[in-house]
């Protein structure tokens, strides 16, 4: 009795609860999942510094059952990693799962979906980004010509201002017409 391991202080849990869409219990569950990815690397009890500095390699995160079959798993890791390489600290991992939770609002989900599809990270989804998305989704099932036609059609239909690329507002307009966007942009912990 009395030998309970405390993962986070009360203040840390309050802070995490304030900046995510999770309850305290869910935050502790997220930490457990994070630790299971690399128990040799992630301490059972984390200090504030470790929560942002101990990073689990992207390759380990990509193997999670919830991401394993997702063709965008690497881009998801890169979009949430502070190092840009896809390696996630606990805080990065918590942010990612918070955005993919049912409680996250639509505008935050749209922002991160845009970030995932913006392969060149220029703040727009251009032709090259669409080609990368199509290649990621279809592998070699479509020809380069078919990829080209689809990318051209998306730009033609979604590019309201005619600049040849999609801004986040144009992307949001398109993505919100997809009836299953909110339900598919989701990871259950």
UniProtKB/Swiss-Prot annotation:
Binding site for Ca(2+) 1: 118, 120, 122, 129
Swiss-Prot/TrEMBL keywords: Calcium, Cytoplasm, Magnesium, Metal-binding, Repeat
GO biological process, any: phototransduction
Binding annotation for Ca(2+) 2: 159, 161, 163, 165, 170
Disruption phenotype: RNAi-mediated knockdown results in reduced photoresponse and impaired responses to flicker stimuli at high frequencies. Failure to sustain an adequate photoresponse during prolonged stimulation. No obvious eye dysmorphology when raised under 12 hr:12 hr light-dark conditions. Significant photoreceptor degeneration when raised under constant light for 5 days.
Xref: InterPro entries: CIBP, EF-hand-dom_pair, EF_Hand_1_Ca_BS, EF_hand_dom
Cellular-component GO terms for this entry: cytoplasm
Membrane-spanning segments: none
Localization of this protein: Cytoplasm
Main location: cytoplasm
MF annotations from Gene Ontology: calcium ion binding; magnesium ion binding
Additional observations: The binding of either calcium or magnesium significantly increases the structural stability of the protein in comparison to apo-CIB (calcium- and magnesium-free form).
General function of this protein: Calcium- and integrin-binding protein. Plays a role in intracellular calcium homeostasis. Critical for proper photoreceptor cell maintenance and function. Required for prevention of light-dependent retinal degeneration.
Stated name of the protein: Calcium and integrin-binding family member 2
Classification lineage: Eukaryota, Metazoa, Ecdysozoa, Arthropoda, Hexapoda
Protein encoded by which gene: Cib2
């Amino acid at each position: 009795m009395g030998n309970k391991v405390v993962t986070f202080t009360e203040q840390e849990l309050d802070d995490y609860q304030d900046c995510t869409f999770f309850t305290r219990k869910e935050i502790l569950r997220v930490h457990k999942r994070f630790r299971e990815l690399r128990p040799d690397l992630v301490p059972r009890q984390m200090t504030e510094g470790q929560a942002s500095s101990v990073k689990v390699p992207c390759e380990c995160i990509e193997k999670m059952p919830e991401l394993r079959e997702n063709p965008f798993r690497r881009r998801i890791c890169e979009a949430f990693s502070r190092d840009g390489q896809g390696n996630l600290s606990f805080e990065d991992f918590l942010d990612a799962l918070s955005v993919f939770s049912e409680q996250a609002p639509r505008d935050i989900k749209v922002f991160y979906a845009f970030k995932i599809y913006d392969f060149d990270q220029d703040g727009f989804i251009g032709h090259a980004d669409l080609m990368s998305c199509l290649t990621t989704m279809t592998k070699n099932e479509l020809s380069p010509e078919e990829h080209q036609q689809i990318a051209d059609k998306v730009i033609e239909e979604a590019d309201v201002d005619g600049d040849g690329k999609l801004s986040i507002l144009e992307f949001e307009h398109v993505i919100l017409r997809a009836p299953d966007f909110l339900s598919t942009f989701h990871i259950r912990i």
